[in-house]
């Protein structure tokens, strides 16, 4: 039986999904399963690693049954995952010693404060490209070792293993034969030197993490190990591709050349720009990260995150009840020619890159007696585009690369008004692909390259199909006037603390 399909596993923050992708890069089947969010204290977020594993087994079985495809036809498996979420488990039994601590969780704030106090900020920045923040995996591992009796001792003896979600899933799928991660996930731990491409002794000492518990770091596309037959109806299937979700989306968008960038409009926004084989150190509050390792070399990216994007549209719907469903926002915004000087700064949880101001809160400016809900809705949508320009401007400043086009995906990329305004306020075209499942496609493409479903990146590029290209329609002076108004609004919001 010909092996012509790739199984892509997308292990996300609220659900796990499995998709089967054919040689043309088309998704031919999907299965999805949600799992519980655990909130032990305010600001803490955890998952049961065993429940995540059970959800992965369920979606694999579900998608194979739904599509009537035999596991004998699967050429390889690609994995993409919520980044930074951390698991520590017993090497012998395979049981986690504590819940997985999720990327959103703030429970390691005290550890981060101590690192700052001890003056580690520059060291971490210069070796990892990251900031000291509870977001990243290293402090989560330290927290678990501190809070589970005997864990530090057992880790030093080599009895415990550490991993991000990709590592945990590969370990389980292969029956413990492979304890690995890829470059993209390793670069989110605070423990990995992204320049020397190795676990860094100084960083390990800083957080007192025993080297014995760390996974081997491998390229993002190669055959790592085969699954154990009992997970796949009697088949051994190669696990052949891994990338963290945002890097996978960059790959799935075909952003293979230096200077290509994508924006994922989800609850927040994640912008990544490929900077090629050279790491760019940011002077503007962006993260430097590994994009992927492929063909014997690594490529780097600049990353900026916007905290509030799609959630601002949900706020219009659920908080203010201005729209019945999120998609109505496009209709309201398109009814008027402009937002008439109204600016919404959606800093509900502070502002991310490039401001990094956690104390600022949301604000609205420019209201008059004539302001109606159309202006308010339009201004809210426009705020997503302004924030995107802020980040992309910082990327251009850091990299010295001028953006030619922006590729987009995620829920809010379906909003035609927003995409047109995004193009106008950036002054570059915006391209939306037909297949918006770019994260899953990225994982599938990485696996498919390793097992020979696709020959090279040039062949993959052909499977990226354009849905719509939004060309710039706004005049330069109008663009700069609007953008200047946005900056005034942000400054005013920051003054009100």
Swiss-Prot record:
Residues that hold ADP according to the record: 13, 17, 267, 310, 411, 415
Entry EC no(s): 2.7.1.30
UniProt entry keywords in alphabetical sequence: ATP-binding, Glycerol metabolism, Kinase, Nucleotide-binding, Phosphoprotein, Transferase
Pathway: Polyol metabolism; glycerol degradation via glycerol kinase pathway; sn-glycerol 3-phosphate from glycerol: step 1/1
Regulation: Activated by phosphorylation and inhibited by fructose 1,6-bisphosphate (FBP).
UniProt enzyme class: transferase
Name the UniProt record assigns to this protein: Glycerol kinase
Reaction catalysed by this enzyme: glycerol + ATP = sn-glycerol 3-phosphate + ADP + H(+)
Subunit and interaction comment: Homotetramer and homodimer (in equilibrium).
Species: Listeria innocua serovar 6a (strain ATCC BAA-680 / CLIP 11262)
Residues annotated as signal peptide: none
GO cellular component: cytosol
Family matches, as Pfam families: FGGY_C (PF02782), FGGY_N (PF00370)
């Amino acid at each position: 039986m010909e092996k012509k399909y790739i199984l892509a596993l997308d292990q996300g923050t609220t659900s796990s999904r499995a998709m089967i992708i054919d040689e043309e890069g088309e998704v031919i089947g999907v299965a999805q399963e949600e799992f519980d969010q655990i909130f032990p204290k305010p600001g803490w977020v955890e998952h049961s690693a065993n429940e995540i594993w059970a959800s992965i087994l369920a979606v694999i079985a579900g998608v194979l049954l739904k599509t009537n495809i035999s596991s004998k036809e699967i050429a390889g498996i690609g994995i993409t995952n919520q980044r930074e979420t951390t698991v520590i488990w017993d090497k012998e039994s395979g049981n986690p010693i504590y819940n997985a601590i999720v990327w959103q969780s703030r429970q390691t704030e005290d550890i981060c404060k101590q690192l700052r106090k001890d003056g580690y900020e520059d060291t971490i920045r210069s070796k990892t490209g990251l900031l000291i923040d509870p977001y990243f995996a290293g402090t989560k591992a330290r927290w678990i070792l501190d809070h589970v009796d005997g864990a530090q001792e057992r880790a030093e003896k080599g009895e415990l293993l550490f991993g991000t979600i990709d590592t945990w899933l590969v370990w389980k799928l292969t029956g413990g034969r492979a304890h690995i991660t890829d470059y993209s996930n390793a670069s989110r731990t605070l423990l990995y030197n992204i320049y020397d491409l190795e676990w860094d002794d100084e960083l390990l000492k800083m957080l007192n993490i025993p080297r014995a518990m760390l996974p081997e770091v491998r390229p993002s596309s190669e055959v790592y190990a085969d699954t154990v037959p009992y997970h796949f109806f009697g088949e051994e299937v190669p696990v052949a591709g891994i990338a963290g979700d945002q890097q996978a989306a960059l790959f799935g968008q075909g952003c293979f050349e230096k200077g290509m960038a994508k924006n994922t409009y989800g609850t927040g926004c994640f912008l990544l720009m490929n900077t090629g084989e050279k790491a760019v150190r940011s002077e503007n509050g962006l993260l430097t990260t590994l994009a992927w390792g492929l063909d014997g070399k690594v490529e780097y990216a600049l990353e900026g995150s916007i905290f509030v994007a799609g959630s601002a549209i949900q706020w219009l719907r659920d908080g203010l009840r201005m729209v019945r469903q999120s998609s109505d926002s496009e209709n309201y915004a398109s009814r008027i020619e402009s937002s008439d000087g109204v600016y919404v700064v959606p800093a509900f949880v502070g502002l991310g890159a490039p401001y990094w101001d956690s104390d600022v809160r949301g604000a609205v400016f420019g209201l008059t007696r004539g302001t109606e809900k159309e202006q308010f809705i339009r201004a809210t949508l426009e705020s997503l585009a302004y924030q995107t320009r802020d980040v992309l401007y910082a990327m251009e400043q850091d990299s010295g690369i001028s953006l030619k086009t922006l590729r987009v995906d995620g829920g809010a990329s379906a909003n035609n008004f927003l995409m047109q305004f995004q193009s106008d306020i950036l002054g570059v075209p915006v391209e939306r692909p037909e297949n918006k499942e770019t994260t899953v496609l990225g994982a599938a493409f990485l696996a498919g390259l390793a097992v020979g479903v696709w020959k090279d990146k040039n062949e993959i590029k052909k499977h990226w199909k354009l849905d719509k290209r939004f060309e710039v329609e706004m005049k330069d002076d109008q663009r700069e006037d609007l953008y200047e108004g946005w900056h005034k609004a942000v400054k005013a919001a920051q003054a009100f603390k």
